[in-house]
């Protein structure tokens, strides 16, 4: 049985998950899609910056930094 989706920002360093939903405004979604962050994409949370913002994730073989407010709107299914 798979776990319920949680926000990307609630993961801890080293956690792996799969993107299940992106609840950002339509104007912000194309930028993430261009960087390869799509529903169904596996990700790994690498680290939070010292003050908690930004959040660094590994997606499709490269590291990507997101603002914490963006990470809070991305729902993932933990692996």
Residue ranges and their predicted role:
Residues 1-79:
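Compact, glycine-rich, soluble single-domain proteins
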């Amino acid at each position: 049985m798979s776990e319920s989706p949680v926000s990307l920002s609630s993961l801890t360093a080293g956690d792996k998950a799969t993107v299940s939903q992106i609840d950002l405004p339509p104007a912000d979604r194309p930028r993430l899609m261009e960087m390869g962050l799509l529903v169904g994409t596996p990700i790994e949370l690498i680290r939070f910056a010292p003050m908690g913002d930004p959040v660094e994730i590994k997606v499709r073989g490269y590291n990507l930094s997101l603002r914490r407010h963006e990470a809070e709107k991305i729902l993932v299914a933990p692996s």
